[in-house]
Amino acid sequence: MKVRASVKEMCDKCRVIRRNGRVMVICTNPKHKQRQG
């Protein structure tokens, strides 16, 4: 899980979602998991 100020999709499998008011990226590749913070 990467914590970043700006979250971006890194591949075509990445999806930007909102969870509990947080912007997150979920992906089949665990290296691409990100959270805004």
UniProtKB/Swiss-Prot annotation:
Localization per record? Plastid, Organellar chromatophore
Query: Main location per UniProt?
Result: plastid
Domain of life of the source: Eukaryota
Q: Lyase: present as a keyword of the record? A: no
The protein's UniProt keywords, in alphabetical order, are: Organellar chromatophore, Plastid, Ribonucleoprotein, Ribosomal protein
One GO MF term, please?
Answer: structural constituent of ribosome
Annotated GO biological processes are:
translation
Give any Gene Ontology cellular component.
Answer: organellar chromatophore
Parts forming coiled coils:
none
Q: Which NCBIfam families match?
A: rpmJ_bact
Recorded family membership: Belongs to the bacterial ribosomal protein bL36 family.
This chain belongs to the protein called Large ribosomal subunit protein bL36c
Organism of origin is Paulinella chromatophora
Originating gene: rpl36
